[in-house]
């Protein structure tokens, strides 16, 4: 229920708080941990925005992505100690807040670790440190990612935090544990439904682009595992021979001021162009032919275990956009091979690109462009292309509408979760006193 006894905190991100709550600077509640790890007894951990601070092996199991590997000459004795119940300021805290650790281990020296110096409910602060309003406050300490300024513990230490009595912290944390768990379970079920729809869409595409639409035509063995048998009148062709352009974008000179808009792989990794993440460069559009993005281009992510292989079809786009060097721009002669059909073929091969097509380094993995250009794909007559493309478009459109509806539900649930976290960690709402009360 709404708390009627509120006072103005005089802090913009916090707003009003209960009249019996205190405001205390972070440095009086938390202490920076400076000890270094004993690498023979502890495990290497990774801060993640979704799972908190977890072992690297668990991260790979949960996400299917490889964590950033340490360089071979890294002195592991210089790694920072972190213990269960500690908090971590990561290089991405400006985006996702501070991460909570449920494990003992070591983390990179680039991270800052801190722990409570007073008796507090750690879960209460775990929620506070992931609150969007608090994260917006953290952003004021970074100015801009392009400035390369990480969040310092000293900046956090001078930030006023809401500090209710311990029993109130306990009530809020317990209440949020239950509510957030309920929302997360709903979200998990909906996400599984989306995954099932995506798998169904993929199966339709795979069958259409490898077997065609007529089940009665004579077939032949392609000799390629992911294709299997294909129609006799189809052929295999290297990607480079059916494209008119297959090049990476530019290495932009990023600027804070508005300049030439740059499309990075992060912008389309979720299946759509997210212009909220747009960056700008001082690079003139007209002088960078190689990096220009045009309508009916295929954009292909070339870097990173979690993004590599993600693909996007540019239906229409205004003139003036450049792609960054982590994006491969693929262009075809539509009279020979449909660019959208090639996009559909690429869209079913994410795991293939993320595995076989990746060449490793100590810190990052990249698409092997030579292997990619020489990869064989099925090429069918133009009449078959048109029929297959029409068939996939119709089927995919219906499935995509269902997925969009479910994604909107996920967005609503996430916004609802964020709102109740903010309302309770800042005291604007009181924890219901009756068991089973609903807000």
Regions flagged by a language model, labelled:
Residues 12-16, 70-71, 112-117, 157-163, ...:
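Short, well-ordered beta-strand elements within core beta-sheets of diverse protein domains
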